[in-house]
């Protein structure tokens, strides 16, 4: 059965809500949270059961026949989502917004995030040595504006391209952009070739971001074409990620005279970043040169190879740094040793800014920050620009985070006891809540003199104090206020 064939007046409230969500997020597969599972229905169930080889079942939803259904355990969802993303699909995560035990009627649910090939955040789904770019193309009749970003690192770029379909497509392939948003004026040939020939996730959207709360990103940009291109991409990110993009760096305008012009065919024939034989990194120039110690360095080297400098002053400046490190061989080796201990700070900061970081990320951040003073000492000794002082942040992590916490934030045991008094009290309530209520009940009986005073709980009112009518005379206004504050 297809969704469009269902009589919505007969659907159960939950299934009607699902159908309404699907109408809103038509181009996505909705993972609908039901208890410990994400369920899919109608066409989504048929598609996902085929793509992921899941068992297709059915669900009673008020209709004469059962609605197609399949599901996955929520705790293993990342594996299944990753498979769907690699096949070019978008996944909308519909979460329960309240505790089912406390819900009145149907549990409130809504889409909290849309995951696509250009908006993946999970480190397990990303290649640490490559950027994961998402871009937008806006047609200005005589030129195209391409804006692209890696939301995991915050890097943001924009450039103007010739009004030539082949050049635009080649540029997208050259940059390795994983997802593209196009405005409706863009020639549909670009849309279809990117989607059908190159399996790049594509969307046709005209909306632009109307606010001005990201003006710091474009503060030095005067060309309105760049600004429009940025806001076209930004709107898609904010709407689909359901979160702020405050970590985006100031936009970098790429101009043709800054770098050596090179098309995708030159890049392939020279085997700069992948071999022609199997299109793998191995045996390419990048593979040969990449002896970097961090994921950040590997991505930077790849960018340098793909965009060779042509400005003499910039080239000489880069040579000067290389020359210093060659002369200071012992210091260089010591620096490489310390860099090896640094995790991927760009993506760690990205996950923290996007509020998806876990305990492991915080520990990696702490261990990385611990090494920075040693790196700064070396930079200072060769009169090079030092890194910012982050000692206060490092100390905060030392004081607050356990050495070996569980990976998941919901498991607890992340923040040390004694770091925050209010949190300690909440922990005590959670682990010994019944003891707290019993002790509170005894204290209130002694304080008020009401021997039959009881502390109760229900879903409607929460915790409450119960006394008999005969004891009302002992309840004063001061007593009422005191009880309200303490319960």
Description of each model-found segment:
Residues 2-324, 333, 337-353, 357-442:
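Charged catalytic and DNA/RNA-contacting regions of genome-maintenance
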Residues 33-34, 456, 468:
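A secondary-structure boundary/capping signal
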Residues 134-136, 452-456, 464:
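Short, surface-exposed charged micro-motifs
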Residues 328-329:
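Short intracellular "coupling" helices and adjacent cytoplasmic loop segments at the cytosolic face
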Residues 375, 396, 400, 463-478:
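Cytosolic, long alpha-helical scaffolding segments
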Residues 435-455:
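Flexible, glycine/threonine-enriched loop-and-boundary segments that flank and lead into catalytic domains
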Residues 481-487:
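Conserved small/polar residues in nucleotide/adenosyl-binding loops
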